[in-house]
C-alpha cells in the first residue's frame, strides 16, 4: 500500500488483503518474538494500523473515519522463504501462501500505544521509519498510501462486520 512508485496497474484496483489470526500472532509491547525454526528468510514491515472504535458494516468512504478510534503501529513479520508455494503455477492465485508466511506465534508485534484519532492532526502525513539494529531500512510517509484509511475501512466493512478493537493494518512502505 506504500510503494516507492505506485504501479499504474494498481490504480483503480480494489485493495489486496490477507487475514492474520489475532490469538497467537499478535504480541504486545515488551512481548517476545521467536523466529520460526522453519524459516531462514525472516523479515519485517513497519505499518500504521487503525483501531476500530464502533461496530460498522456496509459503511461508505465518506463516513468511515467516524468508526476509527485511533492509530497504532505494527511490525508485520514474515517468513519469506514460505511465501512462494513450490510447484505452483507462476502467476496463479495459488502461487503465494500468505497464511503460512504471516501467521506464526508472535508474527505481529503491536503498539505500544493507541493514539486517539482526535490527537492526530493529519493521519495522512505521518513519517514511518524502521531501523534494524542501527541501519535505517524503511523511510516513508502515510501520504504515499495508495488506499487511504477511509477506503480500507469502508472496503472491509462491505465484506464483513468490523468490531471495536479490530485492527486494520494499512500496508508497508
Tell me what each language-model feature is.
Residues 65-68:
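Alpha-helical secondary-structure segments
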Residues 1-39, 44:
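Extended, compositionally biased flexible segments
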Residues 15-17, 24-25, 32, 47-49, ...:
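Structural motif
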Residues 80-173:
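Catalytic-pocket segment enriched in acidic/His residues
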Residues 27-28, 59-61, 81-83:
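Short helix/loop capping segments that flank catalytic or ligand/cofactor-binding pockets
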Residues 5-8, 34-42, 48, 56-63, ...:
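A generic local secondary-structure boundary/capping motif
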Residues 18-22, 44-48, 52-54, 72-77, ...:
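Short, structured patches in soluble enzyme cores that scaffold and shape functional sites
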Amino acid at each position: 500500500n506504500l510503494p516507492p512508485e505506485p504501479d499504474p496497474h494498481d490504480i483503480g484496483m480494489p485493495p489486496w488483503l490477507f487475514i492474520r489470526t489475532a490469538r497467537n500472532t499478535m504480541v504486545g509491547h515488551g512481548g517476545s518474538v521467536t523466529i520460526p525454526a522453519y524459516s531462514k528468510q525472516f523479515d519485517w514491515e513497519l505499518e500504521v494500523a487503525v483501531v476500530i472504535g464502533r461496530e460498522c458494516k456496509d459503511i461508505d468512504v465518506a463516513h468511515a473515519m467516524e468508526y476509527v478510534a485511533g492509530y497504532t503501529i505494527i511490525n508485520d513479520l514474515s517468513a519469506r522463504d514460505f511465501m512462494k508455494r513450490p510447484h505452483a503455477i507462476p502467476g496463479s492465485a495459488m502461487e503465494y501462501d500468505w497464511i503460512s508466511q504471516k501467521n506464526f506465534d508472535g508474527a505481529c508485534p503491536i503498539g505500544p500505544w493507541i493514539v486517539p484519532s482526535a490527537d492526530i492532526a493529519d493521519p495522512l502525513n505521518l513519517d514511518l521509519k524502521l531501523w534494524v539494529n542501527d541501519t535505517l531500512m524503511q523511510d516513508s510517509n502515510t501520504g504515499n498510501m495508495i488506499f487511504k484509511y477511509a477506503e480500507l475501512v469502508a472496503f472491509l466493512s462491505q465484506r464483513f462486520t468490523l468490531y471495536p478493537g479490530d485492527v486494520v493494518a494499512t500496508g508497508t512502505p
